[in-house]
Amino acid sequence: MAKEDAIEVDGIVQEALPNAMFQVELENGHTVLAHISGKMRKFYIRILPGDKVRVELSPYDLNRGRITYRMK
């Protein structure tokens, strides 16, 4: 079975939570719980509240996501 395509959306980090989790408000107004992707963790990319980020959402659970990119 092929992996389903993730939905990519942009948002702003509202709050940093324990265990590298973040509360992210998406452009459409929804709020999701997101964690950092492995490559961002590996290269110690810091994410702070107020940062604009790109989030991948699974089509199966739209309340959780993975932060894949931090905008400059």
UniProtKB/Swiss-Prot annotation:
Broad class of where this protein is predominantly found: cytoplasm
PROSITE patterns given in the database record: S1_IF1_TYPE
GO CC terms: cytosol
Highest taxon in the source lineage: Bacteria
GO molecular function, one term: ribosome binding
Coiled coil: none
Localization terms from the record: Cytoplasm
Keyword rRNA-binding applies: yes
Domain S1-like, chain residue ranges per copy: 1-72
Annotated keywords: Cytoplasm, Initiation factor, Protein biosynthesis, RNA-binding, rRNA-binding
InterPro entries to which the protein is assigned, alphabetical: NA-bd_OB-fold, RNA-binding_domain_S1_IF1, S1_domain, TIF_IF1
HAMAP family to which the protein is assigned, alphabetical: IF_1 (MF_00075)
Similarity comment: family membership: Belongs to the IF-1 family.
Known function: One of the essential components for the initiation of protein synthesis. Stabilizes the binding of IF-2 and IF-3 on the 30S subunit to which N-formylmethionyl-tRNA(fMet) subsequently binds. Helps modulate mRNA selection, yielding the 30S pre-initiation complex (PIC). Upon addition of the 50S ribosomal subunit IF-1, IF-2 and IF-3 are released leaving the mature 70S translation initiation complex.
Subunit: Component of the 30S ribosomal translation pre-initiation complex which assembles on the 30S ribosome in the order IF-2 and IF-3, IF-1 and N-formylmethionyl-tRNA(fMet); mRNA recruitment can occur at any time during PIC assembly.
Classification via PANTHER family: TRANSLATION INITIATION FACTOR IF-1, CHLOROPLASTIC
The protein's name in its UniProt record: Translation initiation factor IF-1 2
Lineage of the species this protein comes from: Bacteria, Pseudomonadati, Thermodesulfobacteriota, Desulfovibrionia, Desulfovibrionales
Gene that encodes the chain: infA2
